């Protein structure tokens, strides 16, 4: 372009710039130029609000649409793709949980605990949650791995030992699969299961009989073969059939087969009630052994027995007491005896039982002094393989899944072998044996034995040999954990004082409320209830006397003496009852309660039973049992030096339910009287219906306001279920009287003195403070103490006034 052209172009641009609409536009640069902001106006604000509302409405509609699609279209039942996606999600979560468990063994242990039945998992989870709340992860993990995991492993071994092969075979029958979960069942479930077992035994009997009884010509041996087939089915359930020892086949049988026992045995094996008792006992024992396996029976949890076994024993005792109070004994003449009084007067009363044994031990002590014998106190314990739990509450690694019953059988077998060896060596002793539980329920024995002084070392060495011969390597040179012996020094205490503590703490804990057990840390009196529940559950004989005449003849003689005293009437006290003077001397000794004289008159200690002068007589019961057989009952006493027997149970008593109270019977009369035994109408309606009659005739209810604490306690415990319901209804209908505020009355001088003392202690001494103290309140005085006014004195203590 030439210079002239450029001048012409520049002139054109200058001419164009003279107009605004023709000026050149500026180039846009977003990095350098600021964006122009639109002016704010009312219209722009309104448009912005409408846009926001439309956006929120659009989001709400989209969310609602998604919910509708997910509910009706994209769910597992309608959309297979969605279902497959959900399944893949669950599988991935399960794989993730499995991987976490594989790398975290604690979660595996927790899952195993939660998979256990409730009677196992609930108490274990409570302990696990406690350790988890401590905030110590290492201790929590160590507790799971070192305590909970071994407990679960031991639990599986115990279950395998309980369910034998034959027992599992019986559970494979139709309807009997509940046998596999027998420890987890309740009483109602066990009752239903026992009915099914009885029905199965009935079918076995029908199959065994076949056409055997089509004719009357049936031999007793054929009936016995039928019984053997039913008994074999019973043995598969680990239950010994009735009369099994008498009826089973023996290679060298000396006596003829008692075929008359077969009907009663078959009747029991076909009875649902009999099976319920057997299965319930088995269930309780198996359940207790499972709780022992997981360390829930120990000094750290519940000593001697589990907590639920203790509660069951209390409930059983309560039901027995209600049964005794609702029944009475009636004879042919119409005389009645309250059944509760009869039970309390018998040896079932713990106080009578304790007194009788203490009198017997005292008699042995007097005889030993007369003979010049020495007394030795022994303690025998089972090997460590019988103990399930250590003293610290952790599982014992040497435990071999043995039961409490097996530990008792071990001691019985050991003692029988020792007595055989002792008699073979010509050694004799007499005394008493006490069976006690360790904190985990394992049995150990205490023996108080009397013997000749020259035989003491030999007998002690022989007993030590039998007590430690099993698992001898675990003891080493110290045999104290298994066997202890102590020669009783008369200067320190008598033999009776040694054994008195063990007798009392295993019966009712009389006189031991202040002593604490070193093993459990509880009072010996409180432990007595647990010990009795332990002995009842595992069927352990707590006390056993040996080398002396039987105590049942002693009881029958005392009963005979009481009957003779009532019949003699005006005769002189101490007059002979029996014609034979030797027998009458034994009767007099028993009546006086002197066991020493009774034993010596019977022939003395270490005398075989066949040489005792008086023995217990038995007879066959006239009335048959529910199974058709006739049992054996006590008749009285008899003696080989006198003819005939002496009956001490001449009067036949029959147990009947007590008669209904007349007032209760009248309450159920009228047009609304029920046609059944009980009245199912609401109690409030009954009370309203008879309220007018009672108000007109006078209130015949017992006035409990005039009773003391003991009478009120006895009255409330003697009430039946109906009386309890009526009392509860009366309490709901009658409005309780509000107790007026108690305010102490003081003189003006005492009030001024109280105000002065309050001001001296730094209080205001106002009328409000004085009125609060006079009404029984208290005022905080600092350091956790409170002041209160009692007996015209201002006192200060950290306890509330009502606790005094």
Swiss-Prot record:
Catalytic residue positions: 498 (o-(5'-phospho-dna)-tyrosine intermediate), 502 (o-(5'-phospho-dna)-tyrosine intermediate)
EC assignment: 3.1.-.-
Keyword Hydrolase: yes
Molecular function terms, GO-annotated: endonuclease activity
Signal peptide residues on this chain, from the entry's feature table: none
InterPro entries xref list: Replication_gene_A-like
Protein's UniProt keywords contain Ubl conjugation: no
Broad class of enzyme this protein falls into: hydrolase
Record-stated family: Belongs to the phage GPA family.
UniProt-recorded name of the protein: Probable replication endonuclease from prophage-like region 1
Organism of provenance: Salmonella typhi
Lineage: Bacteria, Pseudomonadati, Pseudomonadota, Gammaproteobacteria, Enterobacterales
């Amino acid at each position: 372009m030439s210079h002239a052209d450029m001048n012409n172009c520049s002139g054109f641009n200058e001419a164009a710039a003279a107009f605004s609409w023709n000026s050149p536009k500026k180039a846009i640069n977003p990095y350098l130029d600021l964006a122009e902001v639109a002016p704010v106006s009312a219209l722009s604000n309104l448009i912005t609000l409408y846009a926001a509302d439309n956006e929120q409405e659009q989001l709400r509609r989209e969310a609602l649409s998604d919910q509708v699609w997910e509910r009706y279209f994209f769910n597992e039942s309608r959309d297979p793709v969605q279902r497959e996606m959900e399944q893949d999600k669950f599988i991935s979560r399960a794989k993730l949980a499995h991987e976490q468990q594989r790398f975290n063994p604690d979660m595996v242990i927790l899952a195993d605990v939660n998979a256990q039945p409730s009677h196992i998992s609930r108490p274990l989870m409570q302990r696990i949650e406690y350790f988890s709340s401590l905030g110590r992860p290492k201790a929590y993990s160590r507790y799971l791995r070192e305590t909970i995991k071994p407990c679960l492993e031991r639990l599986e071994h115990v279950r395998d030992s309980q369910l034998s092969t034959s027992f599992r075979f019986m559970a494979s029958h139709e309807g009997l699969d509940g046998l596999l979960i027998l420890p987890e069942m309740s009483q109602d479930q066990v009752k239903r299961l026992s009915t099914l077992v009885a029905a199965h035994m009935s079918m076995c009997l029908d199959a065994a009989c076949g056409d055997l009884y089509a004719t009357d010509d049936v031999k007793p041996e054929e009936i016995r073969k039928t019984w053997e087939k039913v008994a074999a089915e019973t043995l598969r359930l680990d239950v010994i059939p009735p009369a099994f020892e008498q009826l089973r086949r023996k290679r060298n049988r000396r006596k003829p087969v008692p075929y008359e026992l077969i009907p009663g045995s078959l009747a029991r094996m076909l009875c649902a009630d009999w099976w319920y008792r057997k299965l319930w006992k088995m269930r309780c024992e198996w359940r207790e052994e499972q709780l022992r396996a997981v360390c829930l029976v120990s000094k750290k949890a519940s000593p001697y027995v589990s907590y639920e076994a203790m509660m069951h024993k209390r409930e059983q005792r309560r039901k027995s007491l209600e049964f005794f109070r609702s029944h009475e004994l009636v004879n042919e003449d119409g005389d009645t005896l309250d059944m509760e009084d009869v039970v309390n007067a018998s040896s079932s009363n713990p106080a009578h039982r304790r007194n009788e044994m203490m009198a017997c031990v005292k008699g042995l002590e007097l005889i030993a002094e007369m003979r010049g014998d020495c007394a030795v106190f022994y303690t025998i314990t089972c090997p460590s393989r019988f103990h399930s739990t250590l003293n610290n509450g952790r599982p014992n690694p040497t435990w071999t899944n043995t039961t409490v019953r097996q530990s008792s059988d071990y001691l019985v077998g050991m003692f029988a072998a020792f007595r055989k060896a002792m008699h073979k060596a010509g050694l004799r002793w007499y005394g008493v044996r006490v069976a006690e539980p360790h904190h985990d329920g394992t049995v150990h024995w205490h023996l108080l034995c009397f013997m000749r002084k020259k035989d003491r070392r030999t007998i002690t060495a022989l007993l030590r040999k039998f007590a430690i011969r099993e698992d001898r390597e675990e003891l080493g040179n110290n045999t104290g954990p298994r066997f202890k012996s102590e020669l009783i020094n008369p200067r320190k205490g008598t033999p009776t004082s040694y054994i008195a503590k063990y007798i009392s703490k295993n019966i009712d804990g009389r006189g031991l409320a202040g002593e604490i057990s070193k093993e459990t840390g509880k009072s010996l009196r409180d432990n007595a209830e647990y010990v009795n529940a332990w002995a009842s559950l595992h069927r352990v004989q707590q006390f056993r006397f040996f080398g002396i005449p039987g105590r049942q003849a002693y009881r029958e003689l005392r009963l005979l003496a009481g009957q003779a005293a009532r019949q003699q009437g005006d005769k002189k006290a101490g007059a002979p009852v029996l014609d034979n003077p030797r027998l009458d001397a034994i009767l007099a000794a028993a009546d006086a309660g002197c066991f020493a004289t009774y034993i010596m008159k019977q022939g003395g200690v270490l005398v075989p039973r066949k040489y005792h002068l008086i023995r217990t007589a038995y007879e066959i019961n006239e009335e048959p049992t529910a199974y058709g057989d006739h049992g054996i009952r006590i008749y009285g006493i008899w003696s080989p030096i006198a003819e005939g027997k002496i009956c001490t149970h001449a009067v036949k008593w029959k147990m009947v339910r007590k008669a209904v109270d007349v007032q209760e019977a009248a309450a159920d009369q009228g047009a609304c009287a029920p046609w059944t035994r009980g009245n199912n109408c609401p109690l409030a309606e009954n009370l309203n219906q008879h309220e007018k009659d009672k108000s007109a005739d006078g209130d015949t209810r017992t006035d409990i306001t005039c009773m003391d604490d003991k009478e009120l306690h006895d009255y409330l415990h003697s009430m039946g279920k109906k009386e309890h319901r009526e009392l509860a209804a009366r309490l709901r209908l009658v409005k309780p009287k509000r107790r007026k505020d108690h305010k102490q009355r003081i003189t003006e001088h005492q009030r001024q003195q109280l105000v002065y003392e309050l001001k001296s202690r730094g209080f205001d001494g106002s009328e409000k403070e004085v009125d609060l103290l006079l009404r029984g309140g208290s005022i905080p005085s600092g350091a956790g103490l409170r002041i209160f006014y009692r007996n015209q004195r201002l006192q200060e203590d950290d306890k509330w006034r009502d606790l005094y």
